[in-house]
Amino acid sequence: YNSPSLDDGTIAYHRVFGVVTANSYWYFSSKQLEQDIIAAENNPQISAHLLHINSPGGEAWYMDRLSETLRSAKKPIIAIYEEYCASAAYYIGCHGQKLYATTNHDFVGCIGTMCSFWNFEPYFEKLGLKKIVAKATNSSRKNKIFEDLKDGKSEDYIKNVLDPMNEQFLAEVKAMRSKLSELGD
């Protein structure tokens, strides 16, 4: 994106495929997209950004920074959705001044925040594996929020982790897609 040999009017192509992660060397990375947007913004030969999105979503980490960068972009952003543009992918795509789905069957939306994981401890115990945890004297609350979540007590995790991310996500979508702010929850 920062090559001086690009033709004037070049459109920066940004591929958002697969699961959204903050860090990845092999797949999509929201941190890398932010760097690419900044580089394209600084290249006078580039006239616009094209976000090509096919993603079911992914993690919310770093989305606030990426949203700031997309919101502050001076060059137009066009988003094309192919098959899926859901959850964290929609968080990215909602920044387009123009949004296009490739077919009437593309899945767009799924605005919300959740966490899911598998608890393999009972399976490991059947195999004879036992988890051993040692905590420093002054670290009795270390990872308590995750231990509570694993034990079916999700209230603190929802209140302190998911709800703040969800509020940020909803506020960004409503700010970028003003017609959606008129819709009910």
Q: What label would you give each PLM region?
A:
Residues 80-86, 185:
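Glycine-rich beta-to-alpha transition loops that act as phosphate-gripper elements at the mouths
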Residues 1-75, 84, 88-177:
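Small-residue-centered hinge/linker elements
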Residues 179-185:
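A local structural motif
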